[in-house]
Amino acid sequence: MKNLLICIIKMYRKYISPLKRPSCRFYPTCSQYSIEAIEKYGALKGTLISIKRILKCHPFNEGGYDPVK
């Protein structure tokens, strides 16, 4: 399951992300953060952590450096 999720994120980064303008307010980007979270915490907890991060990625949040803890 973990590898499938990471594969989906990588496909998003390769095929969908280039069609959009860069908009992630964080470093590492939300997709890289998601990969790192899934690798570190597994499919379920990593996905939940990723969703929490993606919900913070909006114009009213200043963003910045936010590594997986």
Swiss-Prot record:
The keyword ATP-binding does not apply. Keywords: Cell membrane, Membrane. SMART domains: Haemolytic. GO terms for cellular component: plasma membrane. It comes from the Bacteria. The keyword Cell wall biogenesis/degradation does not apply. It is found in: Cell membrane. It is a peripheral membrane protein. It holds the Pfam family YidD. Could be involved in insertion of integral membrane proteins into the membrane. Belongs to the UPF0161 family. PANTHER family: MEMBRANE PROTEIN INSERTION EFFICIENCY FACTOR-RELATED. NCBIfam families: membrane protein insertion efficiency factor YidD. This is Putative membrane protein insertion efficiency factor. It comes from Clostridium botulinum (strain Hall / ATCC 3502 / NCTC 13319 / Type A).
